[in-house]
Design a protein with these regions (language model features):
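Short, acidic, metal-binding catalytic loop of nucleotide-sugar glycosyltransferases
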Residues: 16-25
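A conserved acidic beta->alpha catalytic loop
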Residues: 24, 30-40
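Conserved donor NDP-sugar-binding/catalytic core segment of glycosyltransferases
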Residues: 87-119
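Glycine-rich, basic loop-to-helix element that forms the pyrophosphate-binding segment
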Residues: 53-71
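Conserved short acidic donor-positioning loop in nucleotide-sugar-dependent glycosyltransferases
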Residues: 18, 32-36, 58
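The conserved acidic donor/metal-binding loop of glycosyltransferases
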Residues: 80-84
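Active-site beta-to-alpha loop of glycosyltransferases that engages the nucleotide-sugar donor
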Residues: 2-13, 34
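Short aromatic/hydrophobic "clamp" motif used to bind/position activated sugar donors
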Residues: 76
């Protein structure tokens, strides 16, 4: 799931890259936290995602909670819409979780477009 606040092309790239990121069945939910409803709705329709929210800016955390509220999947991934998934990367993240059942939260290695490591998890 992702929280979209007036996304541009990054939402389209995010959704398009998900197909190669996993061989698993995906349920994709977008919390619409901004005013670009047409952009969010069109991208969701192209990629089989569901949109929740009416564009009210609830803040990131409340938007994420809204998107996750009705999910019953074993794994819930919260990702920013400016992320581009590498092929197999979501499978690798879920496999790490399966290999470490005591883990309550997992964080992937994030890379900048130039390949350098982004300092996440600060």
């Amino acid at each position: 799931m992702t929280v979209a606040f007036n996304p541009g092309e990054e939402l389209e790239r995010f959704l398009a890259s998900l197909a190669a990121a996993t061989a698993r069945r995906l349920v994709v939910v977008i919390a619409d936290n901004g005013t670009e409803h047409d952009v969010v709705t069109a991208a969701a329709q192209r990629h089989g995602a569901r949109v929740v929210g009416d564009g009210t800016n609830l803040g990131y955390g409340a938007g994420a909670n809204l998107a996750a509220a009705d999910l019953e999947e074993d794994w819930i991934v919260v990702a920013n819409p400016d992320l581009v998934w590498k092929p197999g990367s979501l499978d690798a993240l879920i496999d790490a979780g399966l290999a470490n059942p005591a883990a309550g939260c997992l964080g992937p290695l994030l890379l900048n477009p130039d390949g350098t490591v982004y300092p996440s998890g600060r």
